[in-house]
């Protein structure tokens, strides 16, 4: 009986701690909507730059938004032409048509960066000179 009472108190304490920790972690990062990030962005590496249009038009997959741009430049940057993108709480992911990630761009103080195992680094940033609704 004493063990059962102690166990219930301990389980309640653990549940309280997890709810506090989980609640603060969940509220620290916000998932932006596609409409907040849509528009023309500049994608670049050390050799090339191209404009990419992030839209708020969903692909048939449902959780991915369409992406448009210069197919030759995009194929050079990603190894294939990406079809879409999706926002994440700490960046954005460029995807193929099925939603598989081709690159994750982490939102850092100096910009949005994707780093690859082969040492390549891509940067993407909003094009401030273009209209949001293009």
From Swiss-Prot:
What are the subcellular locations of this protein? Periplasm
Q: What keywords is this UniProt entry annotated with? A: Disulfide bond, Metalloenzyme inhibitor, Metalloprotease inhibitor, Periplasm, Protease inhibitor, Signal
The family database entries (Pfam families) matched by this protein are listed as: Inh (PF02974)
- Gene3D superfamilies to which the protein is assigned, alphabetical: 2.40.128.10
Q: Which SUPFAM superfamilies match?
A: beta-Barrel protease inhibitors
Q: Which positions make up the signal peptide?
A: 1-26
Q: What is this protein called?
A: Alkaline proteinase inhibitor
Lineage here is: Bacteria, Pseudomonadati, Pseudomonadota, Gammaproteobacteria, Enterobacterales
